[in-house]
Amino acid sequence: MQNKIIIHGARAHNLKNIDVEIPRDKLVVVTGLSGSGKSSLAFDTIYAEGQRRYVESLSAYARQFLGNMEKPDVDSIDGLSPAISIDQKTTSKNPRSTVGTVTEINDYLRLLYARVGTPYCINGHGAITASSAEQIVEQVLALPERTRMQILAPVVRRKKGQHKTVFEKIQKDGYVRVRVDGDIFDVTEVPELSKSKMHNIEVVIDRLVNKDGIRSRLFDSVEAALRLGDGYLMIDTMDGNELLFSEHYSCPVCGFTVPELEPRLFSFNAPFGSCPTCDGLGIKLEVDLDLVVPDPSKSLREGALAPWNPISSNYYPTMLEQAMASFGVDMDTPFEALTEEERDLVLYGSGDREFHFHYVNDFGGERNIDIPFEGVVTNVNRRYHETNSDYTRNVMRGYMNELTCATCHGYRLNDQALCVHVGGEEGTHIGQISELSIADHLQLLEELELTENESTIAKPIVKEIHDRLTFLNNVGLNYLTLSRAAGTLSGGESQRIRLATQIGSNLSGVLYILDEPSIGLHQRDNDRLIESLKKMRDLGNTLIVVEHDEDTMMQADWLIDVGPGAGEFGGEITASGTPKQVAKNKKSITGQYLSGKKFIPVPLERRSGNGRFIEIKGAAQNNLQSLDVRFPLGKFIAVTGVSGSGKSTLVNSILKKAVAQKLNRNADKPGKYHSISGIEHIERLIDIDQSPIGRTPRSNPATYTGVFDDIRDLFAQTNEAKIRGYKKGRFSFNVKGGRCEACSGDGIIKIEMHFLPDVYVPCEVCHGRRYNSETLEVHYKGKNIAEVLDMTVDDALVFFSAIPKIARKIQTIKDVGLGYVTLGQPATTLSGGEAQRMKLASELHKRSTGKSLYILDEPTTGLHTDDIARLLKVLERFVDDGNTVLVIEHNLDVIKSADHIIDLGPEGGDGGGQIVATGTPEEVAQVKESYTGHYLKVKLQQ
């Protein structure tokens, strides 16, 4: 077998016909500037070809289900293995997908509970066991010798009535005695029972004394009792003790029944096990009273009920007024001053009580009717569930929130599944074990107390669970719970979860391609991640990791630097070799940073801010431990801490949502906190994340930053356009008129090929230029609109230098380091880091008020150290204008450049949620308890 992967003539995207050799069974890091072609090499060439060759080997029937693989633009690749890609984009947003289901740990947990779990009665009557007649006989014979007993068959349990037919049937079956409510009677002499009281009736099957030779008689009596008692039987030992037995998993006292224990009972995705109220989601969409009555100081007449404020018709306000008049509720009293009874009437309706409703609509239609009053909450619920209009449903959804299901308390399962415990009655049910952090879960498994028989059954299952949990622990995810929804994980977290699943599969000879697995990881956890990667390599796998993290690069066996620039200035291999060899390479920008020739300097002084603060008191969402936090305004603030310490909860769930609620009237509820002050000092909140700037290829840098409007204005003002009577709209590829109608302005046409990949071909009419020939006859400085869209930002800056309005907007795109992108590049082809910087660019050219708060969650994702240097310059421009920039970040170059650090921790999950250190980087570096401070100290001394 070859010991190298040899690539000849790779041309995907911006790759310039490159040849490269990659050693097999090694940890290989591919690095380079954002947009240099790293992903084009790793994912679009190597992974695409490895995957395609594997799929090609399958039958045509199987291929149709797998989607089709396009052959990458490369001459040849030798030495490939089947490839598995672990990237960031493929996290499931399905609410049924959790950490437990993604890692398959749930499958093993379900098996564990089905095999060694014991059901306990939910009404507190102890363990529920199922016994065969044979087992019951053995237990009875184990009683002390000479024990006197009677065998009873329960036929009525806690039921009202006189039960005359029951006694007739008992007599008919030939039985003589019965026990009614604890007293023994001859079946013909039972006193008349009270109709309105609950009664218990048992048939006396046999009376025995425990001694040798009774087994056969006892067995017959037990079988008869089970038959008559529907699988239940009681042994009364005459000394006041009673033993209850059942052939079913059913409580002999109250009858609570559990089906046979099997894995599907513990699945919240199967109707058999899921909670019937929330269908296994753990949350239920309920009307939120805070959204229905946003301002309780208003009266009903002033519009206290938000859903019924008149928008298009006066129907609901009229109904409300007539109903309140009928039921005697004052429309002018503030809502909060109404009595509880009156508020209930307004919210939940009048029940059966009716009022007379008379209404005439705008078209003369009339209603004259006596009806019950529905109540606003009931009305919102009904309209949400019954409407056929998406618009109405969305409006009603605005008054609802997802609340924890009251039936299953968020555990997602039904009572029958949640009554099964492992480790005795004081043990845990499957819902509780899923709520534990992975670190606590591991500890619980180690302390699990099982009988010898249970241990034998559980050993292989527990080993599988333990291994998978250990992998999650080793990649820095010890703070997650198995019940955590997969959709709420960050890109780095979901990638490391899939990494743990792959390590658990113990495959060898596979080619793994990873996309920045260190994202969202604190330096402290990075070493464990690198160890995990080395473990995968040592199993005999090849790992190709696209990464910018210096530690990972230095620990790699082989380093490939793609560059030298980005976009059309990249696409070449600038250096390839061991990390030490690359560090000595003068052509490699990465090498210059690794050797310390280039570095991001520490700012000479820290800003003092404007003296104002946003202060949050009592932040207690998720693992935050009732924090009081001050965010100084007019500064560059970094929120730091190990993974899972509560950074995103504090910034995204509380601060961002609370500010958005006050400034933008956002309906999204912030997390739990006591109070927030200082929002009046800011006017705008700008959240700059890495989500795509457009979902379709029609969105591009020119349309997103707004510069395309100005360019179209410019073309409309040319003499040729004026002569032809073309307005600005003529130069849009989104509307009829100027665009090519053959491809609707897309420039490409999709041809479906069924068993072969869909083929995208340039439109034959416009040849990919999007516009019709008449539009393209209008020129500005010798270029038509299609040629302008094909220009890179750098070229466009020179071309439009004489028009300040356009040049200013294009300059901002260059300032964020995207000079290599073309103005018309489809938004769908931009990476997360590029999309984020495009958002920054569109903010840069807006007039600054100096009162904006910018929030960025890990802005360095996908960025090379050289890109980070540029990003910092842009962020500092915002702060120099008097604005506040708040970043959640692990990158030490960014952290050391901040004016103020808020470090959370000390650990992740339950061990976090506290403030470990605050202050300038120099101050935080002195705090011994701070992991961030420890790494920062080294960085500041470099």
UniProtKB/Swiss-Prot annotation:
Residues 308-589, 609-937 form the ABC transporter domain. One of its GO terms (molecular function) is ATP hydrolysis activity. Keywords: ATP-binding, Cytoplasm, DNA damage, DNA excision, DNA repair, DNA-binding, Excision nuclease, Metal-binding, Nucleotide-binding, Repeat, SOS response, Zinc, Zinc-finger. A zinc finger (C4-type) spans 251-278, 740-766. InterPro entries: AAA+_ATPase, ABC_transporter-like_ATP-bd, ABC_transporter-like_CS, ATP_grasp_subdomain_1, P-loop_NTPase, UvrA, UvrA_DNA-bd, UvrA_inter. CDD domains: ABC_UvrA_I (cd03270), ABC_UvrA_II (cd03271). One of its GO terms (cellular component) is cytoplasm. ATP binds at residues 32-39, 641-648. It is found in: Cytoplasm. The keyword DNA-binding applies. GO terms for biological process: nucleotide-excision repair; SOS response. Disulfide bonds: none annotated. Pfam families: UvrA_DNA-bind, UvrA_inter. Its main location: cytoplasm. Belongs to the ABC transporter superfamily. UvrA family. HAMAP family: UvrA. The UvrABC repair system catalyzes the recognition and processing of DNA lesions. UvrA is an ATPase and a DNA-binding protein. A damage recognition complex composed of 2 UvrA and 2 UvrB subunits scans DNA for abnormalities. When the presence of a lesion has been verified by UvrB, the UvrA molecules dissociate. Forms a heterotetramer with UvrB during the search for lesions. This is UvrABC system protein A. The gene is uvrA.
